Amino acid sequence: MQVYRFREKRSGDRPCVVTIGNFDGMHLGHQALTGAVVNEAKDRDLSSALVTFHPHPQEILHPRRPVQRICTPQLQNRLFDDSGIDEVHVIPFTPELAELDADAFASRYLLQRFKLEKLIIGYDFRFGKNRTGDFILLERLGQENGFSLEEVAPFRIKSQIVSSSLIRQLIREMRFSEVEEYLGRPYSLLGTVQKGEQRG
């Protein structure tokens, strides 16, 4: 897996299947989304790419209410790698970026960056100033720029939609068995799995 800061030039010009979002925690819903991207790319002999943000947008938009990260950036990158994604592109989220309208955002961070064949997004993905960018806008951009668009349905466990905000709430309430069910892996406060003394 190749990791790029957005100021770094992407090596090569291989056509891509792309997804974009925060992916905090890489829970089962995120894994379903990245799995769809990886499978589509493999089926079409394309590169799979994931676009994400650092810091978390909420840290810039609402600095007095800092977001509780579910896992460390180091663990997040390891989970991206485990997912089979070929490329991760990290956008520095700044106050200036937060002011970009949706069309300008899509042009700068998707259309100019990638030879985009297909974009796969989560059901709740929004982008651009005031979150005005949505599926309808992306569908129009796809028709104008020759890429296809797919929206992945929410991932549910027992009718409950798995989301990062839900997992943060469960962590605050110390309901760790449910946290691990929604993450699909063990959870620790440090963001890494801690081994015991293994005395039997």
Regions found by a protein language model. Name each.
Residues 2-8, 89:
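Short acidic-hydrophobic, aromatic-tinged amphipathic segments that line or gate anion-handling sites
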Residues 9-13, 95-98, 156-160:
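A short acidic, often aromatic-flanked loop/helix-cap motif at beta-alpha or helix-coil junctions
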Residues 9-72:
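N-terminal catalytic cores of NTP/NDP-binding nucleotidyl/phosphoryl-transfer enzymes
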Residues 68-76, 100-106:
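Glycine-rich, highly charged phosphate/nucleotide-binding loops
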Residues 80-82:
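ATP-dependent adenylation/nucleotidyltransferase module used to activate substrates
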